[in-house]
Amino acid sequence: IIFGARISLTIGLVPTLISMAIGTVLGLCAGFYGGKTDFIIMRLADVMLAFPSLLLAMVVMYTMGGGLINIFIALSLVNWAGTARIVRAQTLSLKEKEFVEAAKSIGVKKWTIMFRHILPNCLPSLIVLFTLNIPSAILSEASLSFLGIGAQPPSASWGLMAVRGKKYLFSEPWLSIAPSAAIMIVVMAFNFLGDGLRDVLDPYLKEQ
């Protein structure tokens, strides 16, 4: 279980970081530039959100094959759209603020405004979203491993351990129960952490 935690948590962290980085950049561009840039990025995000992320990840994995690297790529490519929409919405609001207008008036470059002035104000929401996306990635890996297209031996993720233990479900049920319980505990822990951070970082909830 401890060894499998290394693989499962890595799968939770790395694709989440990559997908959120992609979504953040695209969301900033869509919200700040508007026009055709906004239209193209948001329509692409709508297409991604129209299908379950696990289904899209399955298509990518069936195309590329199993393995940890391909899991990283698949989960990174299919989970950026939600982040992009959130960052875009905040960018649309922030770019009308006085500090952004002041930066524009003195000739600050657009990319500098986006990453030095707007992005820091999006960080509280991104931190909360990050903690909530990690368990989603862990569950996606477990589902892909259950279907035989996720982590492959000799890797030992919790998802793969649970799948390989199902052969002995009646004689040695702990082989599947233990990694499944580990997944459940970690997912719940990250969800509670995300809820707590949202309560702390959301100024509206603070006022309440």
Language-model features, listed with the residues they occupy:
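Amphipathic cytosolic juxtamembrane alpha-helices at the membrane-cytosol interface
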Residues: 1-10, 14, 34-42, 92, ...
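C-terminal transmembrane helix and the adjacent membrane-cytosol boundary/short C-terminal tail
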Residues: 61-64, 68, 75-78, 124-134, ...
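Hydrophobic alpha-helical transmembrane segments in multi-pass membrane proteins
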Residues: 8-23, 50-58, 120, 124-141, ...
